[in-house]
Amino acid sequence: MKPEKVIFVDESLEKSFNGLSEIDPIKKALIRAIKTLQEDAFSGRNVKKKLIPKLFIQKYGLNNLWIYNLPDGWRMLYVLTPSEEVQIIAVILDWMNHKDYERLFKF
């Protein structure tokens, strides 16, 4: 299912993304990931509810979390939200390296 749009959770995250160099491999991977999400909102891996970090539940009030694998062990985290109960919006919450990802999920 195609989402209505893919957005960043807040302006500071979007500024971080826009601040990345055009030749940065992470920015290129994020752009590819966004294009993939625009075609299929469910292209990531769904996190079981009991494994969603409490920090994210408290900070964003979310009830679902998706992980999109990026190259070199990086991960992009996003949530799917309903828009007028018909369309879906994919909201990018963060991207992180594998070490930070493991720390967040307590692996």
Task: Place the predicted regions along the sequence by residue.
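Intrinsically disordered, low-complexity boundary segments flanking structured domains
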Residues: 22-23, 51-57, 79-81
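Arg/Lys-rich, positively charged N-terminal/basic patches that mediate binding to nucleic acids
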Residues: 1-36
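A short, surface-exposed loop/turn module that caps and links secondary-structure elements
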Residues: 39-68
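Enriched for short, Lys/Arg-rich terminal
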Residues: 2-4, 18-19, 65-107
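Generic secondary-structure microfeatures
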Residues: 34, 38-41, 72
